[in-house]
Amino acid sequence: MALNRLVFSLSLWLGFIGAAQAASSEPLPPSKDPWYTAPPGFESAEPGTVLRVRPAPGNLTSITANSSASYNILYRTTDSHFKPTWAVTTLLVPELGPDSLAQQKFQQSALLSFQVPYDSADVDASPSYSMYSASNDSSAPYTAALGSGLFVSVPDYEGPLAAFTAGIISGYATLDSIRAVLSLGLGLNITNSPRAALWGYSGGAFATEWASELAVQYAPDLVAGPVVGAAMGAPLANITTFMHSVNGQATSGLVPNTLLGLTSQYPDVRKYLVSKLNDDSEYNRTGFLAAEGFTVTESGVAFAGIDINKYFQNGTDILNDPKILALVNREGIMGYHGVPKWPLFIYQAIPDEVTPISATDALVEKYCAVGADILYERNTVGSHYEETNNSYKAAVQWLEDVFSSQHDINRAQGCVIQDVTRNTTSGDLVRRKDVQKSVFDLWSAAW
């Protein structure tokens, strides 16, 4: 094992030197960038081992507010079959120095793992590439965190097969991204009891929750050490109810993305799924499989308002097909792989039209019955998308508590479930066009 670590360390830094020389080149989509491959023999490395690192190509640092440097890190992780695979995370470094917020507030030792809801079965939609064209709305949380002195890791948690809604690999890849960053440093003070927290909304909360419940068995080192908590909004607790909720609605494009993402690691189930598609009709195989190359926005346009069952022979109810349900039960139902040991803040709008709150209620009830530490806030107003703004402040304040150890004082509180009313989208606190500035102000006020 020591020899393997030595070999990987040598190849890593040789690769880093070469990458640094080419850092000014434009980013390539992962499917066309040879850097997105693991070196020979990576399978023998331990989960979380760094396999490659490079300064992020192109202008990512300059276009990401409050960032002083950015790196791509390719690391060893584990797929849903419990076999070695790899994933990539992008590490964003805040402004550093003796007078920086990173030093004054956190001694350069605080890491936020931010899971972006990229919700796509296309590997080229992975954050390490899509961040170059991210809107202010989607980048606001992590750029604001950078502005408050946090290091930010943004993992491509779906892995190299873009396994959207595959909970096992999503959780493992998220956990191993934290391990990889903490082993590497790159400005992060890893000798001064570093603290890490996770945050995600919707698809990003899906990965955040799976990481939290899998950590007990997969990453006890993170449970016992640096991870201090996880915040998650509208976490897609049950993928079956989620797909039924969005099918035929404006967000119907999430269904093909889910079915293709779920089956990307299961060739037999993918073959079965494809065999059930129509050969020729308005809703045919070609149209459905086009989602493999779509971002979530593109799928939203292509499939808006369509009952996805129309793509299947005789209108088959594919969402209730036994083979599909068996896979969902393995990969898409939370609460069956372990009880999170670090504190959780879970928030969701009661009227959520994308993922029914009843599934989140059931998950929280299950965890609370076995002693989990959860603050669960159910917002009486707002849609799925409005809740991203409505509960920004609450999430930021809760993360401030766990980073500053204030939550540790009150850990005996156990589960707290409460209905709240937050309607910041009306303009009282956060207007959509001003979300970047407002979220930065929230982080700044917290610390």
Curated annotation (Swiss-Prot):
One of its GO terms (biological process) is lipid catabolic process. Residues 1-22 form the signal peptide. InterPro entries: AB_hydrolase_fold, Lipase_secreted. Keywords: Glycoprotein, Hydrolase, Signal. Induction: Expression is positively regulated by the trichothecene cluster-specific transcription activator TRI10. Its EC number is 3.1.1.-. GO terms for molecular function: triacylglycerol lipase activity. Pfam families: LIP (PF03583). The active site is at residues 202, 352, 384. Glycans are attached at residues 59, 66, 136, 189, 238, 284, 314, 389, 423. It comes from the Eukaryota. SUPFAM superfamilies: alpha/beta-Hydrolases. Pathway: Sesquiterpene biosynthesis; trichothecene biosynthesis. The biosynthesis of trichothecenes begins with the cyclization of farnesyl diphosphate to trichodiene and is catalyzed by the trichodiene synthase TRI5. Trichodiene undergoes a series of oxygenations catalyzed by the cytochrome P450 monooxygenase TRI4. Trichothecenes are sesquiterpenoid toxins that act by inhibiting protein biosynthesis. Belongs to the AB hydrolase superfamily. Lipase family. This is Trichothecene C-3 esterase.
